[in-house]
Structures are given as structure tokens and as C-alpha cells.
Amino acid sequence: MNVRDNTLIVGSEIIETPPAIRSRYLETRLLAPVFMSYFQEGADWTTMPRPVLSDASFDLSYARDTESTLGGPTEPIEDPQASPFDVGLEMILDGAQCLRLGRDIVINVANQNHALAVEWLKRHLEPAYRIHVVHRMSDNHIDSMILALKPGVFLARHAGIQEMMPEPFNMWKFIVPPEPEPTSFPQYEDDDLVLTSPYIDLNVLSVSPERVLVNEACGGLIRELERNGFETVPVRHRHRRLFGGGFHCFTLDTVRAGDIEDYR
């Protein structure tokens, strides 16, 4: 359902990223007919090296640091098992770890798997695009940590995000909404699989420089966006913590209006 997670659209190129979650390994195959149609129209279609995803593939240091799992639940591999297919640490990265800002791409790196994947992307995309690394802004995805609402304006989880951003983007305006209200979420049992943090509603979708799709249950977020001059479109999505994503996650921007910008 969260089609943005394992795909990165850069210019006219579709890049399938190497997933970290074994159960999502073949997820982009469901999008193959869509990608094929764009390929036949002239788009480039690239797949990053696919990881084996044995226990030895993972850098476990971040998952073992339970105090730093900022993006949501992270499950450590408690007892790694050897496999005849082990190849050592592999490149692993989700498209949702990347924030595209014209010719600049900001990528969250929380472990060595991410760093290897970023090195591949640098060799593949530079110098046409500039790759910037932010360290451990989250465990992986950053689209409930920071989103670009329009050129010059970010929506951020907390004020400290600004210090993590590279120049010149740390000089943009950062809108920090109120903390999420516990009453805006359905109540779940202890054994329910809750996939996201309560900050998932920052995962809004900008459909124009002035208009933002936002969860109707988030009155504080809606008021803060409107106070900053945005038109909000409230949309109902009650069980976003179970579905593991918001409106930004649900969409993949294969078509955009306008030309690529350079904010340098």
C-alpha cells in the first residue's frame, strides 16, 4: 500500500531501492505494469542491487540501540544465524529515506547498510544531482520527520531537525506542529501490530505550493498549517498506525508539473 517506500523517482528515472524488510522484497513487482508503461514512454528504469537479506546482511548496531529508534518500531535480530548464502553487510535503503529538493537529495543514514546504498546512489546520480547525508534523523524513513511543503518551507517533527539539515536548506522556514493528541487515534490492544509512531500524521501530501492533504483528525496540525498560509484538505484515515503510512506514503510522484529546480 505504501508505494513510495521502495521506489525513488529522480527526474525521468524510476529507481527500485533494496528493501530491508524481507516480507516486502517483491512488493515493487506489483508496480511492474506501471513502471513498464513509463519505460515504454521513454523513462529509465533501474533496480539497485538486490540484497540476500540473510541475518549476516544487516548492520544490527542501530536496532540494538533501543533508545534511538525514532521512526517507529525496530525489531532487532536477537540471535543471528549463519547461512550458506551469507555475503556480509549489504546495501539496504528505502526510497522513503530520501528527501528530494530539486537537484539536491537528502538521505538519512542510520547504519552501514544505508551508507553502502548511498555510495551506490552517489556513483549513479552525481554530478547531475547532489547527495547529502544526515545521520540518524530516524531509524530509516524520514517522511514523518521532515517534509517539504513548498520551496522554502518544511514541516518538521521538532526544532532540532533544522540543525541536521545541510546548507542552504537549514535556512528555510521550519513549521513545527503541536504534539499529536492521543485521542486522535483509535485504541488498540497490546498484541495489535502497530507499525508507526504517533507522528505519522506529519506524513501529509502537498498537491500544490498552497494546498496540503492532511488527516482530518489532526486539528492542531491543520490549524498550524493554516496559520502559516496553507489551504488544508482534511481527509479521513483512521487506522494509519496499522496501515503503516500516511498520504505521502500512499503515493508515488511519477508525474510532476514544472521543471526541475536548483535551490543553490
Report residues per predicted region.
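The feature marks the mature, well-folded catalytic cores of soluble enzymes
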Residues: 1-264
